[in-house]
Amino acid sequence: MSQTKPNAKRLKRTPLLIGLALVIAVVVVGGAMMAGGGRNSKTIEISPTPVVSDDIQQSLAAFRGKVVILDFWATWCGPCRMEIPSFIALQNKYRNQGLEVVGVSIDPIAPRGNPGGAPAVAPFMQSNGINYTIWMVNKPTALRGYDVSQGIPTTYVLDRSGQIVRTYVGVRPQSVFESDINSLL
């Protein structure tokens, strides 16, 4: 009996330790973002595989003149995965009217031991039928100007001039984004 009590205590502490590790990871990423940096960018084109972006703000310049839904997510994030069908539907419905959905995977900078990581992104895109641009960031400074320290999914709605008009933390129904899109197109 004395052996089960320490194991039971350890099992009760495990979720707390996991939660603490996630909070620390978010704080570290948020702090690194606030430090700025990373001014180089690569040309970004729509691709069936993720493209590395060294600076999200510079990469977004390719979409000036379009309304952009910019979603920060990860393959291992359950709430993020819940929103993907909505983003697929929005891209299908509004692409020809000037909408661009862009997903930014933070998998490459996820905490060690996380089941995601850069190798998980391309297969995830294919198996989920993602029809919109996916960028990956390989360093926290690439997120400069976008705060994801409160958690993911974090989604920004940008107008045609590239200005942020809405920010959402957590899952939102498709109707919320449709309302934003319709007011901006």
Regions found by a protein language model. Give the residues of each.
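N-terminal targeting signals for export/organelle localization
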Residues: 1-54, 167
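A short beta-strand-turn-helix
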Residues: 47-68, 91-94
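Thiol-/selenol-based redox modules, centered on thioredoxin-like
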Residues: 151-185
